[in-house]
């Protein structure tokens, strides 16, 4: 509770057990008790839990502006425990604020003052958490400690946001198609008119002779003479085209938002209502400075100042979907965000931040639990529920202790109980820490609706209301929309929006609000000044980001048993099958083709193994896009950490295959030959991994990646020089083998195996007296090891750069 400017020198006790006690806030005289003389304005205190029932003021004075007796927050809202103070829910701090406008003990309980409201839905008690199994406690956020000097001391204070005349236009992607459709429609209409005129003229000639009425004359007494506007009919039947047309003209840009204005006071919890497609998410993206496409106009002020580059440091955004790494625990997920977003803190202080955030979101008992979900490959990891995952997403945003928190549909996909728990977490942030919360929401239950201090309503890209008395406002409109008894106000608002969008007063309502919003809202903002500045936090180095991401990648790899068991056991099985199939080989004439064949198939199989990881790459990219949109790290450290992890895995797979084949099949056994063969197999495996990563990031879809990847791989295998020797390839497309990295790998392992290698030669016939003759048969007699290894490394660099370009430039989160 924040008590402002009370100078009651004769008050020895303020008894907070105000059950069935009336408080007169208009006149505090020199009495020991606060007497309420307001008739019929009873404050039911059944739902106000105060840990300190008696506030003993030994000095008989309450110092001006220095009392912060905050009523603890009750996490269980009882529908029957309502505090009806007939006040508008304008209290941005969710506190019980008593404003003494003069020093003569006269308190003015003016309902228009934002500091004099008791919001019965925003006062809850943190001590009663058993009913909902929530562990939300009164925070003692470690940022307030003196030893954490890297963060601003006022960073836990909410901010005021004013947005004026926000408009947003985006490219009409169907512009060309709509132009073609319009031309076809006009052409068809002209043909129908010409056919109709021809048939009518011939009928007129015949009817004039017989004295019959023409069809136009016979219908004139039934149909109106006004022409039918076909374009209006088409637009009404195609909503998407309606938004991209102006007076029947197709526009290249679609107007999504038009002159949207409003104000959000500090520490308010604001609900953004409206039907689907009304522009709620677009407005949130613009306010959070996350829009990367389209044209934005208008003005956004934070604490009276225009937003700058440091604005994102003080605001956080929670997306509608919980995109989290399934194998990480709750505390590991939050620690990951703390490591990358709070580089100035020591590791001990980061853990303090993580522990406090876990308490704030009520997941203390689940801190060691994994996020859970379906892993790439189909393995299911048991973990958190949907509501708990949503709270973890909120916790990731709270790591930086933001002043402004945006949420897109935080209750989407949750049952009513989990949705209420999530919204209570947000409400506690506004009441206890003063965070300003703005969230879009769709059809909340009544208990959630009453948590909001302010309601904003969007309809067809325009703001039709922003305030705290929405029901009275709707009843004052021309059609007088009255909320029936026993009706969820949120459902009533959405139903009313549908009626307003179809009524004749829609434009009038929108224009009236756009004209008068300054008088209605800006007057409130002048009550208290804001002088808080926005300062940027430090960012961590790319090397540090790489270290943190690499650590997470290896944990994810070893916790995903399906991934590492499948890939490592797959390499073992391939090596074992090859060895069993070809058996023990000798340097005889009969085994020469077997040796070249086993080398070919080894390269071919290692080239195809990375196809098993397509879903893994796409899953990791989804997490990357979500975290990149939040500016947690740069693209390069993520890409390098991913390639490092893959290089380690391919190292193990190639080593297992090479050892098994060399040991069982008895290939040319000397260290240089084995090392070169193994190194080439490893490079081919890594190269294939890189071009699959590049293709998956270019296409963004598993089926397209598989189609393009297999096409490239089959082309590589055909022109590798084994199935068809290079000398026998047609000249028209024989040059393709020079663009084939697998050809260079195959040529190199053949040289390592047969260069100066003595072969057994029978007396009657000897096709290959030694290994050099084998190389000559494959047109590899002049091939050098350095040439093959160098060209393969160049191809690896090419696919590495292509993959990085694709992941950093393509398939970004477009908002």
From Swiss-Prot:
It comes from Dictyostelium discoideum (Social amoeba). The chain crosses the membrane at residues 568-588, 598-618, 647-667, 675-695, 706-726, 732-752, 788-808. The keyword ATP-binding applies. Residues 194-210 have a biased composition (Low complexity). It holds the Pfam family ABC2_membrane. This is ABC transporter G family member 7. Residues 562-810 form the ABC transmembrane type-2 domain. Its main location: membrane. It comes from the Eukaryota. GO terms for molecular function: ABC-type transporter activity; ATP binding; ATP hydrolysis activity; ATPase-coupled transmembrane transporter activity. The keyword Transmembrane helix applies. The gene is abcG7. GO terms for biological process: aggregation involved in sorocarp development; sorocarp morphogenesis; transmembrane transport. It is a multi-pass membrane protein. Residues 164-199 form a coiled coil. Residues 242-485 form the ABC transporter domain.
């Amino acid at each position: 509770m924040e008590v402002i400017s009370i100078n009651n020198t004769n008050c020895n006790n303020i008894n907070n057990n105000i059950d069935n006690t009336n408080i007169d806030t208009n006149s505090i005289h020199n009495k020991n008790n606060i007497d309420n003389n307001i008739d019929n304005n009873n404050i039911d205190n059944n739902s106000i839990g105060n840990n300190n029932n008696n506030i003993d003021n030994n000095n008989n004075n309450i110092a001006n502006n220095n009392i912060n007796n905050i009523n603890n927050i009750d996490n269980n809202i009882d529908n029957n425990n309502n505090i009806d103070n007939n006040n508008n829910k304008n209290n941005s701090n969710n506190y019980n604020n008593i404003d003494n406008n003069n020093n003569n003990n006269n308190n003015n309980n003016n309902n228009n003052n934002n500091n004099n409201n008791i919001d019965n839905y925003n006062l809850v008690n943190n001590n009663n958490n058993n009913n909902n199994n929530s562990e939300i406690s009164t925070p003692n956020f470690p940022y307030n400690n003196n030893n954490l000097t890297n963060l601003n001391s006022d960073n836990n204070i909410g901010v005021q946001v004013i947005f004026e005349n926000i408009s947003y236009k985006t490219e009409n992607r169907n512009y060309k198609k709509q132009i073609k459709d319009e031309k076809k429609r006009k052409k068809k209409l002209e043909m129908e008119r010409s056919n109709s005129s021809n048939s009518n003229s011939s009928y007129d000639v015949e009817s004039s002779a017989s004295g019959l009425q023409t069809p136009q004359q016979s219908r004139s007494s039934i149909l109106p003479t006004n022409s039918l506007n076909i374009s209006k009919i088409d637009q009404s039947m195609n909503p998407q085209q309606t938004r991209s047309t102006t007076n029947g003209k197709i526009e290249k840009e679609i107007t999504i938002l038009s002159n949207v204005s409003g104000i959000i006071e500090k520490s308010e919890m604001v609900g953004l209502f409206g039907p689907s497609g009304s522009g709620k998410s677009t407005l949130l993206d613009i306010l959070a400075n996350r829009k990367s496409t389209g044209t934005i106009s208008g003005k956004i002020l934070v604490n009276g100042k225009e937003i700058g580059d440091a604005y994102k440091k003080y605001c956080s955004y929670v997306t509608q979907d919980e995109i989290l790494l399934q194998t990480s625990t709750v505390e590991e997920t939050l620690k990951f965000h703390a490591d990358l977003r709070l580089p100035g803190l020591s590791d001990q202080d980061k853990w303090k931040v993580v522990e406090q955030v876990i308490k704030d979101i009520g997941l203390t008992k689940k801190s060691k639990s994994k996020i859970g979900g379906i892993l790439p490959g189909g393995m299911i990891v048991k973990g958190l529920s949907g509501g708990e995952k949503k709270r973890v997403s909120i916790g990731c945003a709270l790591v930086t202790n933001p002043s402004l928190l945006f949420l897109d549909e935080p209750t989407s996909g949750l049952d009513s109980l989990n949705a209420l728990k999530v919204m209570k977490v947000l409400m506690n942030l506004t009441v206890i820490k003063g965070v300003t919360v703005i969230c879009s929401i769709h059809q909340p239950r009544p208990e959630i609706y009453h948590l909001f201090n302010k309601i904003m309503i969007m309809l067809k890209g325009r703001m039709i209301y922003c305030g705290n008395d929405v029901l009275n406002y709707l009843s004052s409109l021309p059609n007088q929309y009255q909320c029936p008894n026993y009706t969820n106000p949120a459902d009533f608002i959405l139903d009313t929006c549908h009626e307003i969008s179809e009524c004749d007063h829609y434009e009038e309502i929108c224009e009236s609000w756009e004209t008068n919003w300054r008088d209605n809202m800006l007057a409130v903002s002048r009550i208290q000044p804001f002088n808080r500045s926005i300062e940027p936090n430090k960012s961590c180095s790319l090397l540090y980001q790489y270290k943190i991401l690499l650590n997470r990648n290896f944990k994810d790899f070893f916790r995903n048993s399906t991934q590492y068991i499948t890939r490592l056991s797959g390499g073992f099985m391939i090596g074992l099958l090859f060895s069993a199939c070809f058996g023990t080989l000798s340097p005889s004439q009969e085994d020469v083709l077997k040796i070249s064949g086993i080398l070919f198939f080894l390269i071919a199989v290692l080239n195809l193994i990375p196809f098993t990881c397509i879903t893994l790459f796409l899953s990791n990219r989804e997490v990357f896009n979500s975290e990149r949109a939040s500016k947690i790290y740069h693209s390069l450290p993520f890409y390098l950490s991913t390639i490092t992890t893959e290089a380690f895995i391919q190292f193990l797979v190639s080593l297992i295959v090479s050892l098994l084949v060399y040991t069982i099949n008895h290939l040319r056994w000397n260290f240089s030959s084995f090392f070169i063969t193994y190194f080439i197999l490893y490079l081919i495996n890594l190269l294939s991994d890189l071009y699959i990563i590049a293709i998956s990031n270019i296409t963004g879809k598993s089926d397209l990646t598989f189609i393009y990847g297999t096409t490239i791989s089959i082309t590589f295998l055909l022109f590798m020089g084994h199935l068809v020797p290079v000398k026998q390839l047609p000249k028209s497309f024989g040059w393709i083998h020079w663009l084939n990295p697998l050809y260079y790998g195959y040529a190199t392992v053949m040289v390592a195996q047969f260069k100066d290698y003595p072969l057994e030669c029978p007396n009657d016939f000897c096709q290959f007296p030694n290994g050099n003759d084998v190389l000559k048969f494959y047109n590899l007699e002049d091939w050098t090891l350095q040439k093959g290894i160098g060209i393969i490394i160049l191809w690896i660099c090419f696919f590495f750069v292509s993959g990085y370009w694709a992941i950093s430039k393509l398939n970004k989160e477009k908002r």
